[in-house]
Regions:
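Non-catalytic, peripheral interaction segments enriched in hydrophobic/basic residues
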Residues: 1-6, 28-149
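Short, conserved micro-motifs composed of acidic
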Residues: 1-26
Length: 149
């Protein structure tokens, strides 16, 4: 497959690989990351947002059935939902991820029993957390060092 940015059909261009014609596409999903011809990762972030919500619903039902400390709930979130939210962020982490950050902030606002209008700074400060953007930056730096070394 070949990425093609323009809508114009190129009739005379035909690319072959092992005597097979390669298709022109606007987006392609590789290992769960949607690669787009225009370079944005909105579809990736949207699908990760939806998948993380699917992982969050069973977690919330466990919280309703069993009384857990906040630290245990955070540990469960970090082990079950956070990997989904940050999947492939070494590649797409340069872009803003508003939907992904919203899952994180909504979880902690619900966990701390504060209103949705509460400042995110206060919400992150109470449990000693950072926005997911910081975690994505750390993952990108670690990945870069891994590639270099």
């Amino acid at each position: 497959m070949v990425f093609k940015k323009h809508n114009r059909r190129t009739e005379n261009v035909e690319l072959l690989y092992n005597n097979q014609v390669l298709n022109f596409v606007k987006c392609f999903t590789y290992l769960g990351v949607n690669l787009s011809s225009n370079g944005n990762f909105h579809q990736t972030q949207k699908s990760l947002h939806e998948q993380s919500l699917k992982g969050l619903f069973p977690l919330n039902s466990v919280f309703d059935m069993v009384s857990l400390d906040i630290s245990d709930k955070v540990r469960l979130f970090d082990s079950m939902v956070l990997p989904i939210l940050c999947y492939g962020s070494e590649v797409w982490g340069f872009h803003k991820a508003v939907d992904i950050e919203r899952v994180h902030t909504n979880f902690f606002k619900q966990l701390l029993s504060v209103k949705q209008q509460t400042s995110n700074v206060c919400m992150y400060g109470e449990p000693g957390r950072f926005p997911l953007y910081v975690y994505r930056q750390i993952r990108k730096i670690k990945y870069w060092f891994k590639l270099k070394g």
